[in-house]
Amino acid sequence: MNVKEFSTVSSTNDTVPRILVVGGGYAGFYTAWKLEKHLRRGEAEVTIVDPLPYMTYQPFLPEVAAGSIEARHAVVALRRHLKRTNVLTAKVTGIDHANKVATITPPVGEPFQQEYDQIVVTAGSVSRTFPIPGIADNAIGLKTIEEAVAIRDRLMSNFDKAALLPPGPERDRLLTVVVVGGGFAGIEVFAELRSLASALL
């Protein structure tokens, strides 16, 4: 990438180190939060970049999917809690570490470049679909609030439809949930959804 292709945003104070945090999830949020706690005002310029303006507390997502807690209780607004951090709601689409410049792509407008002295990459993860036919097209992941709410909405819709049907294959299909993965999230969401189903049936 040619560093001259985009405009460059440099620090307003070139005498302080510029710390760029890529990703506003758990690791990124707490990195910026701890830097605010340990650095004096003006000692460094911290910028955090994430497509979302909030951190998602992922251990609560199974509870959100089952409706045990509201979605707003599983998120932390970045700007509300990071008072001395520059919060950019955008994506980091390129890193030129040799020149210490990151390409930032906002949801509206042209990409620009952000200079840094230190970079912390905590971009997070996405749900894996595995080489299983039908997973990519039909399954819903469980990494974001939006996915947890989508699971809850799908379940409630299926229960409403099943309530109008007599016993049979279509009713069984609507009331069947498959959890792919037996890790922490898989076991938690299985237990939460079973409790939800028991309460509704």
Name each model feature, range by range:
Residues 2-16, 86-178, 196:
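FAD-binding core/adjacent interface of flavoenzyme oxidoreductases
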Residues 2-89, 93, 177-178, 184-201:
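Beta1-alpha1 glycine-rich phosphate/pyrophosphate-binding loop at the start
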